[in-house]
């Protein structure tokens, strides 16, 4: 059975407090004192203290910016080409750093047989997968694939592919790396979608090593389940435009999740022959404070059951597909610190569609 035997996570060097990010957004979005107070309120209610970015500008005086122009209206506003250049200049180095940490002490880089790159915030050909191969001097006959533009649930999709590779190749050493540079796509037009995106999203990278190794402690991947609710297809979307990627994220998304999530979990567990009582740890994508709250309410979870998701949201924001890797790593550290012999983990994430992906794993 395939097993996640190592996890590593990390962020770009520029950390920004939520207060600094509010100040940047306030200068862009607020037209008067009333709007400024409203914006400050939603930022302070976000449940986020700090986020990271490949862009230093969010905490700098306008004269010191390197990405956005030194102008009150941010014109000439960065186009898609400039944003993709920044992705190509920074994503590979961050990915290589985290992959190296992930495999350290487990395997050599030359032992990697499969590479799965996951991102919805940057694309090119040759892409991130080939950049990583070149920088790390990986085997030229390595099998690789890319999970592109699927959104926040894509890490679970990547794990499904890793599980399939391990099932087909007993000696497989699969690396799944989720690299998201969400802040590259900051938009200045005043809209609910842009304001919500500006207060939630962050940059981060998570890598996982998946192997058929029974002797190593880790998360044995047992079951996956996916379901799409098309009634929410207009409420969460991610589209390309000339000025960057555009996010649609309506206030109805938490209600959609609240309506369907408990039923989804029940169906996923039933298909795996499990019940809620079997689950010791819940690994939920920290898509936002309201989303975590409705999950707690709909599933009637005891306080503290989603503590790791809340912690990731507070310290890093929403890093799209990388977020759930951060949560899973925190669960792993807790189990290791407590010398726990075994645990049952249920994970779930959400994205455009509205798509809900889940996984079931045993720590052993």
PLM regions with names:
Residues 1-86, 182, 186-259, 263, ...:
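Condensing-enzyme catalytic core mediating Claisen C-C bond formation in acyl metabolism
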Residues 2, 109-113, 140-143, 169-174, ...:
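Short coil/turn connectors at secondary-structure junctions
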Residues 42, 46-137, 276-292:
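Conserved beta-ketoacyl condensing-enzyme motif
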Residues 48, 90-104, 161, 205, ...:
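Short, well-ordered amphipathic alpha-helical segments that serve as non-catalytic structural scaffolds
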Residues 67-70, 82, 86, 97, ...:
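A contiguous, well-structured pocket-lining segment that forms one wall/lid of small-molecule binding clefts
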Residues 96, 120-121, 139-141, 146-167, ...:
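Claisen-condensing/thiolase-fold acyl-transfer catalytic domains that form or cleave C-C bonds
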Residues 123-138, 176-187, 234-238, 292-306:
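Acidic-glycine-rich active-site phosphate/pyrophosphate-binding loop
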Residues 140-141, 147, 154-161, 178-198, ...:
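Active-site glycine-rich loop that binds ribose-phosphate moieties when present
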């Amino acid at each position: 059975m395939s097993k996640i035997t190592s996890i590593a996570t990390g962020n770009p060097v520029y950390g920004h407090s939520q207060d600094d990010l509010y100040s940047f957004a306030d200068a862009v979005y607020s037209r008067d004192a009333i709007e400024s107070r409203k914006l400050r309120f939603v930022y302070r209610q976000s449940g986020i203290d700090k986020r990271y970015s490949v862009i230093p500008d969010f905490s700098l005086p306008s004269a010191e910016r390197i990405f956005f122009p030194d102008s009150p209206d941010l014109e000439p506003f960065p186009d898609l080409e400039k944003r993709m250049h920044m992705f190509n200049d920074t994503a590979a180095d961050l990915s290589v750093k985290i992959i190296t940490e992930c495999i350290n002490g487990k395997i050599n880089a030359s032992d990697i047989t499969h590479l799965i790159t996951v991102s919805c915030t940057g694309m090119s050909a040759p892409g991130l997968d080939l950049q990583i191969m070149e920088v790390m001097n990986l085997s030229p006959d390595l099998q690789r694939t890319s999970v592109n533009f699927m959104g926040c649930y894509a890490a679970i999709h990547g794990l499904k592919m890793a599980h399939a590779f391990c099932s087909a190749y007993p000696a497989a050493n699969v690396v799944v790396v989720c690299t998201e540079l969400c802040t590259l796509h900051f938009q200045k037009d005043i809209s609910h979608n842009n304001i919500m995106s500006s207060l939630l999203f962050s940059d981060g990278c998570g890598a996982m090593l998946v192997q058929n190794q029974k002797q190593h402690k880790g998360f044995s991947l047992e079951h996956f389940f996916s379901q799409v609710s098309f009634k929410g297809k207009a409420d969460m979307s991610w589209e390309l435009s000339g000025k960057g990627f555009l996010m649609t994220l309506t206030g109805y998304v938490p209600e959609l999740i609240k309506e369907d999530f408990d039923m989804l979990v029940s169906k996923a567990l039933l298909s795996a022959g499990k019940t809620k009582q079997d689950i010791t740890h819940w690994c939920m994508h920290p898509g936002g404070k309201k989303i975590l709250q409705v999950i707690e309410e709909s599933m009637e979870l005891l306080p503290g059951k989603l503590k790791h998701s809340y912690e990731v949201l507070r310290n890093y924001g929403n890093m799209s597909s990388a977020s759930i890797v951060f949560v899973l790593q925190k669960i792993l550290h807790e189990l290791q610190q407590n010398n726990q012999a075994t645990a049952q983990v249920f994970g779930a994430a959400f994205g455009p569609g509205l798509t809900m992906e889940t996984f079931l794993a045993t720590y052993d």
